[in-house]
Amino acid sequence: MATERYNPRDAEPRWQQKWNEDKVFETDNSDPREKYYVLEMFPYPSGRIHMGHVRNYAMGDVVARYKRARGYNVLHPMGWDAFGMPAENAAMERGVHPASWTYQNIGSMKAQLKAMGLSLDWSREFATCDVEYYQHQQHLFLDFLEKGLVYRKQSKVNWDPVDNTVLANEQVIDGRGWRSGALVEQRELTQWFFKITDFSQDLLDALDTLDQWPEKVRLMQKNWIGRSEGLTIRWEIVAETAPAGETEITVYTTRPDTLFGASFLAIAADHPLAKDAAAKNADIEAFCEECRRAGTSLAALETAEKKGMDTGIRVRHPLDPSWELPVYVANFVLMDYGTGAIFGCPSGDQRDLDFARKYGLPVVAVVMPQDGDAASFSVGDTAYDGDGVMINSRFLDGKTTEEAFNIVADRLSAASLGNTPQGERKVNFRLRDWGISRQRYWGCPIPVIHCDDCGVVPVPKKDLPVKLPDDVTFDQPGNPLDRHPTWRHVSCPTCGKDARRETDTMDTFVDSSWYFTRFTAPWEAKPTDPEAANRWLPVDQYIGGIEHAILHLLYSRFFTRAMRETGHVAATEPFKGLFTQGMVVHETYSRGAGGSREWVAPADIRIEEIDGKRRALLLTTGEEIAIGSIEKMSKSKKNVVDPDDIIASYGADTARFFVLSDSPPERDVIWSEAGVEGAHRFTQRLWRLISEAADALSAVAPAPATEGEALSISQAAHRTLKAVENDYDKLWFNKAVARIYELVNALAAPMTRVAAGEGDATYRAAVRNAAEILIQLVAPMTPHLAEECWMALGNEGLLARTGWPQYGETLVIENDVVLPVQINGKKRAELTISRDADQNAVTNAVLDLDAVKNALNGQAPKKIIVVPQRIVNIVV
């Protein structure tokens, strides 16, 4: 065969068309084979895919193609997480309807994804903004409402003043909106909530069953759920300082053992006692208002400067009524965590210590390390928050912190205040219910109606969907549904009188909390086909960024439980396996400095390297510009690489191969032109090897060799096959690439010999077998090239429909073993020797090792113990 360079511009569209025509990747739910569901987190249709998408979807595609070849019935769908603020922002900025903007972007991104050659079942595609999708989400909402998993209440919310919408606590990052970056305010609004807290303990306990999730993600969820065992303590208010009608303050604490270190109580700005104090004191009122303007997330409160104001209220210590403590309003106490009140032990908590030092409050050390000296131990600038031994704590002195906890809990449970136990053991959770109301248009309408006579009335299921109106305007911020002249005005389904639709829409995280279930039967007239959902769920391998560890993944776990409670699925967990891939990062380039800095795109510069020093020069002027740090690709810093440009220049397979090969998949991959060119050279080399030998091999039946000069060829291929199987199973793509490179090197000379007409029939059969294994190993990563090579060898049918090769057991056995050599129990050397060597041969070889000779220093060994194929121990 005349060898030409592999041309991806010709090959890739051709094979994509063949796969499409043959419907290779469309999944049949009735297929009886063992199922495998692989899913990458579906994208938001922002307009263009980026290299991070390419890496994410390439990883999922390798898994899908590999499992398909291994004989599984693979489900590998794709859709669009399509609701959200960016579409409304585009509507305001460009005067285009959110739907038009969204579907146009979907069209562009779908074309890009198809150009990557992903083995996706596009027949199951949907966007969450499709009425056909969100009508089922409304159905689920009504089922949850009926089951008591949805409720409505007046609540303090995080208000984003730029996006004009409510944010969940998890969406407030360092006091700012996660999308807009605006400083978040607190407002009182009536909101809809999902009762995720009903499942707090289950969500926590089940983390132990998710052994195919990264430990880091499980720990993040565990901390977010935040289970704590503590004590609710009722503190008596000193009568002369008590507001009218108030007699006590209830505090929840996880450290009742430190009660004798207490020097103050702190309450939230919205605590009833704080409101009473604010009504009487303008300074306190102003301070409470300042607290309300701060973010409500725990992360924001932990980083903010600790501030407080004395209310004038005093309480009696529960273990010593003669001891009075001041009550402060503090900016680090949340009304919706615990009871909205805490006691401060400065010696045992850094936050409390900082607060006490600031306001001149006592600091008494009450816990010291086990090996501490009670006479000299004290707390300086750093609190001691560990376990240890009690000091300065009267009847608790000398007890461990655990013993002290139980003694205090028992004593206060037996004591009474107003005929009620003064203390009560309690389990608390940091997790809050999920507020889903958003004051925006481009989201799933909440299917309820407000009637002056009947109250809140669910929309009857027969009247679903509640469709978004198309005729809306975005000429001002806020929710267009509130301003719509007709849409919100309806008749009450119960009494028939005039009523109003709910104009809030659902948080977009609702849309992504069950989409993986809908993929199992997207044509179903109900939210799910339980039979299909129960067959496919949980997702066997889910792939996405660790930034979703809490929000999306926790919400999805809740939703699956809620859907189980309402009869839609049998599964408890949505995702059996989770993989969080690293980002694609790139150098940054800029000119100027400070406020005048201008970022420059990689496509606009060339890199020059002289004597090991790199310079970046503008293509247009030759001006040298600064090479900055390596960062996540972002439009703002222009360090992005357009996948379309890479595909046009090198082909999709090169892009896929590079992002899979350059670093471990859980780590960031640094994008470099040199790396891409290296991946491209590999694809050309592989094509050259196969195509040059194709004529000589096309009529040869593949068969591994069992002896002779071809044996080493078959051993190399089959050992690589076994190793790469393990790599693919464990998502070690970069290791698989390294082994494939080694196999290509091992096959280069044999392929060249065969191409030159050399080698007997056994040799050619072994080379053909090895070549086919090589092609099948690269197929999940470079599928177009693999199909082209497969066809070049004269194979009929699509490689995408071909089963995975099997390695020969005798061919993968290593002939040599490496034995550790110990002298008196300490490892001194290693011996590489034939697996079949007898004990005498092993003994003689060990004694001939230089390391052993040096260690023995002329001594004769007393005994040499050989454990066959395991270890050698020399006793002297």
UniProtKB/Swiss-Prot annotation:
This is Leucine--tRNA ligase. Residues 1-20 are annotated as: Disordered. Belongs to the class-I aminoacyl-tRNA synthetase family. Its EC number is 6.1.1.4. It catalyses: tRNA(Leu) + L-leucine + ATP = L-leucyl-tRNA(Leu) + AMP + diphosphate. A motif ('KMSKS' region) lies at residues 632-636. One of its GO terms (molecular function) is ATP binding. It is found in: Cytoplasm. GO terms for cellular component: cytosol. It comes from the Bacteria. A motif ('HIGH' region) lies at residues 43-53. Keywords: Aminoacyl-tRNA synthetase, ATP-binding, Cytoplasm, Ligase, Nucleotide-binding, Protein biosynthesis. ATP binds at residue 635. GO terms for biological process: leucyl-tRNA aminoacylation. The gene is leuS.
